[in-house]
From Swiss-Prot:
Its EC number is 3.4.21.92. This is ATP-dependent Clp protease proteolytic subunit. Its main location: cytoplasm. It catalyses: Hydrolysis of proteins to small peptides in the presence of ATP and magnesium. alpha-casein is the usual test substrate. In the absence of ATP, only oligopeptides shorter than five residues are hydrolyzed (such as succinyl-Leu-Tyr-|-NHMec, and Leu-Tyr-Leu-|-Tyr-Trp, in which cleavage of the -Tyr-|-Leu- and -Tyr-|-Trp bonds also occurs). The active site is at residues 105, 130. Signal peptide: none annotated.
Length: 208
């Protein structure tokens, strides 16, 4: 049994009473009804497709009501993360982001790209920003092509972080040169989140 199958077997089921009787949901499907999305684990194309689909579904259900994304991710594939980022900016509902555990690399970028004033971190969460990673082999011309591509990606990611944090491009470029870990309080001071939450605020309860 692989790790994914084991994890799925551990997902709790909840039973809801309806006018038609009882209905069982896995916990994540039930929370999706409350407009809560969980971005947990490495970001790859499969996860990105799931997150994008959930965002589009919730927009279709109610384009005026906020969506909340809980993030606990070490990062992952840049293009997969950008698919989620672009969809967050594309849809009409405001997307609130909440860091639980960690938001590293692309996870940190997605955390910072939530709606202004609605980006949160829990007190003991960690945020890490850095430049994109790349390792290539093959013919010299192919290596050169990939090197130019990763430099272009780095420049674009720096622009996005600068836009959402309010930091200058020069500051972002310097601070992402190496792995840069921040506490929740430091992430707030840097502009990656707007508030550190010890308890859920009333507006978050009402929006979900």
């Amino acid at each position: 049994m692989d790790d994914v199958t084991k994890a799925l077997n551990l997902v709790p089921m909840v039973v809801e009473q309806t006018s038609r009787g009882e209905r069982a949901y896995d916990i994540y499907s039930r929370l999706l009804k409350e407009r809560l999305i969980f971005l947990v684990g490495p970001i790859d194309d499969y996860m990105a497709n799931l997150i994008v689909a959930q965002l589009l579904f919730l927009e279709a259900e109610n384009p005026e009501k906020d969506i909340n994304i809980y993030i606990n991710s070490p990062g992952g594939v840049v293009t997969a993360g950008m698919a989620i980022y672009d969809t967050m900016q594309y849809i009409k509902p405001a997307v609130s982001t909440i860091c639980v555990g960690q938001a590293a690399s692309m996870g940190a970028l997605l955390l910072a790209s939530g709606a202004s004033g609605k980006r949160y971190a829990l007190p003991n969460s960690r945020v890490m920003i850095h430049q994109p990673l790349g390792g290539f082999q093959g013919q010299a011309t192919d290596i050169d092509i990939h090197a130019r591509e990763i430099l272009a990606l780095r420049a674009r990611l720096n622009e996005i972080l600068a836009k959402h944090t309010g930091q200058s491009l020069e500051t972002i470029a310097h601070d992402t040169e190496r792995d840069n870990f921040k506490s929740a309080v430091d992430a707030q001071a840097y502009g990656l989140v707007d508030q550190v939450l010890g308890q859920r605020p009333e507006e978050l309860i009402q929006s979900s």
